[in-house]
A protein has these predicted regions:
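Hinge/beta->alpha junction and helix N-cap segments in small-molecule ligand-binding domains
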Residues: 2-10, 28-37, 90-100, 116-158, ...
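Glycine-rich phosphate-binding loop signature in dinucleotide/nucleotide-binding domains
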Residues: 47-49, 108, 162-168
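Alpha-helical recognition/docking segments in bacterial nutrient-uptake
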Residues: 1-103
Length: 267
């Protein structure tokens, strides 16, 4: 089950490119929820219709993994909660990347930080939130979290709520590019100057970030290359049957036009 963000389009492109080079095809099947996804896996497994599956957006309690283990379909997990999974996986250290983001903003003088997260039931959301709150506490900053769903509307709603507080944040980290662009629009509507009064940082770098005005600072990951890495993980699993963990490069912070030193009142 995939999201609609540019992240997934880039990931799919990388997977497909690498598989095609080995004469294999990528099958995409759109489903509305995990229950429908599980039914699809059962049909694929019972009919031996696929050689392997790639699973994304791992939940804290994820019934899909138990079913895939039961069916015995070779499985690759993308972005799981840790590298210590009983499945082949491509792992991202979301906690360390979040600590890097918070440290950067606090280094700019920000003491009131907020995070607009993805859905809280996702494992990577929890990892980022825990790291965000932990690093804020360690550095003596105040951290607040508002849950979103990766969509434009939730980014708009969350940003309005945060900026409407009596002591609004001077910096906001968004869990994806779509919500960050929506937040930038809200700041313009509310006459909150970016970055002079409010710094914004997107988690997934994309053309949306680069083309916004001002261009959004972002945590940048080469998602296409990660897709190639996922495909290589699939091919190695099929060739050897060995379950291995692969670590993706850490996202790097790209400072553009939406982050700067904190307003004097926040310092």
């Amino acid at each position: 089950m995939l999201g609609f963000e540019p992240f997934f389009m880039e990931l799919i492109g990388g997977i497909e490119e690498s598989l095609a080079a080995e004469g294999r095809s990528l099958l995409l099947h759109v489903v509305p929820d995990h229950d429908a996804e599980i039914r699809t896996y059962r049909r694929w497994g019972e009919g031996k219709l696929v050689d392997a599956v790639v699973v994304v957006n791992i939940a804290l309690e994820d019934a899909r993994l138990e079913v895939l283990g039961e069916l015995g379909i070779p499985t690759v997990i993308v972005g799981g909660p840790s590298p210590n999974l009983p499945f082949a996986n491509v792992w991202i250290d979301n906690a360390q990347a979040m600590r890097t983001a918070v440290t950067h903003l606090v280094g700019l003088g920000h003491r009131r930080l907020a995070r607009v997260s993805g859905p809280r039931h996702l494992a990577h959301t929890q990892a980022r939130t825990d790291a965000f709150m932990g690093e804020c506490a360690r550095l003596g900053a105040h951290g607040a979290v508002v849950e979103g769903d990766y969509g434009e509307e939730s980014g708009t709603r969350a940003t309005r709520a945060l900026l409407g507080r009596g002591s609004p944040p001077s910096a906001i980290i968004y869990d994806n590019d779509v919500m960050a662009v929506a937040g930038l629009g809200v700041a313009h509507e509310m006459d909150v100057a970016v970055p002079e009064r409010l710094s914004l940082l997107a988690w997934d770098d994309s053309a949306l970030c680069r083309l916004s005005h001002p261009a959004l600072s972002a945590m940048s990951l080469d998602v296409h290359a990660m897709g190639v890495q996922v495909a290589d993980c699939v091919l190695n699993l099929l060739a050897s049957g060995t379950v291995r963990s692969y670590t993706a490069p850490l996202p790097r912070l790209v400072a553009r036009g939406t982050t700067t030193t904190a307003p004097t009142a926040d310092g």
